[in-house]
Amino acid sequence: MRPSKRQFDEMRAISFERGVSKHAEGSCLVKFGDTHVLCTASLEEKVPGWMRNSGKGWVTAEYGMLPRSTGERMRREASAGKQGGRTLEIQRLIGRSLRAVVDLQALGEQQITVDCDVIQADGGTRTASITGGWVALYDCLRWMEARQMASVSKVLKDHVAAISCGIHDGQPVIDLDYLEDSAAGTDANFVMTGKGGIVEIQGTAEGEPFSEDQFAELMGLAKKGIQRLVSLQQMAVA
């Protein structure tokens, strides 16, 4: 039995609350169980210098954890004067994942920054950030469309969502919380589109290497999980 008492293929309760920020063009509070992430999408009518006069736009992301999002207070990275390697890795992953389903040419020379701030962490913060980040991005594009600045259907090519899977006590399981993740022999994150395209897979064996058959089981769980997340995204933005 999993520490969370869930079945091996059972995800945590997942919800999206849209429009939670008064100022951001798009926003979403996403909850994967006790992991809560505030995602905001902000529009700037400019692009990075290296993209000027290209006719293309840009989508990027930033990620951070509030000091008391964890069991003990963490020091703010700003007070340390630099971002940690984990933070940089995660925010680059979020940006890559969102750009995978965006037509940058259709966006035009405008930049959307998706900020993902972890309010409460209980495992899977990067997967929640990607999944909720898509909803915030969608709402930002809706805001732009209402002002004839972009077309949602032309810019946003598909859904994108992410889920974690791992091997806990020899059993492949989906959507690990912190206790499960810290004890898992194998941990993997899957990022996929609504059509089933693979954007990124991150997988690591913490102890014993995992087999090809075990990976196939994790992949099967992830595909079903992504389908569920995409359905929830569709209902959230309907």
From Swiss-Prot:
Molecular-function GO terms, alphabetical: 3'-5'-RNA exonuclease activity; tRNA binding; tRNA nucleotidyltransferase activity
Keyword Ligase carried by entry: no
EC code(s) of this entry: 2.7.7.56
Residues annotated to bind phosphate: 86, 124-126
InterPro entries per the UniProt record, alphabetical: ExoRNase_PH_dom1 (IPR001247), ExoRNase_PH_dom2 (IPR015847), ExoRNase_PH_dom2_sf (IPR036345), PNPase/RNase_PH_dom_sf (IPR027408), Ribosomal_Su5_D2-typ_SF (IPR020568), RNase_PH (IPR050080), RNase_PH_bac-type (IPR002381), RNase_PH_CS (IPR018336)
Alphabetical list of PROSITE patterns matching this protein: RIBONUCLEASE_PH
Coiled coil regions in record: none
Transmembrane segments: none
Keywords: Nucleotidyltransferase, RNA-binding, rRNA processing, Transferase, tRNA processing, tRNA-binding
Annotated catalysed reactions: tRNA(n+1) + phosphate = tRNA(n) + a ribonucleoside 5'-diphosphate
Heme is among the record's keywords: no
Single GO biological process annotation from the record: rRNA catabolic process
Highest taxon above the source species: Bacteria
Assembly notes: Homohexameric ring arranged as a trimer of dimers.
Function summary: Phosphorolytic 3'-5' exoribonuclease that plays an important role in tRNA 3'-end maturation. Removes nucleotide residues following the 3'-CCA terminus of tRNAs; can also add nucleotides to the ends of RNA molecules by using nucleoside diphosphates as substrates, but this may not be physiologically important. Probably plays a role in initiation of 16S rRNA degradation (leading to ribosome degradation) during starvation.
Family: Belongs to the RNase PH family.
Name listed for the protein in its UniProt record: Ribonuclease PH
Upper taxonomic lineage: Bacteria, Pseudomonadati, Pseudomonadota, Alphaproteobacteria, Hyphomicrobiales
This protein's encoding gene: rph
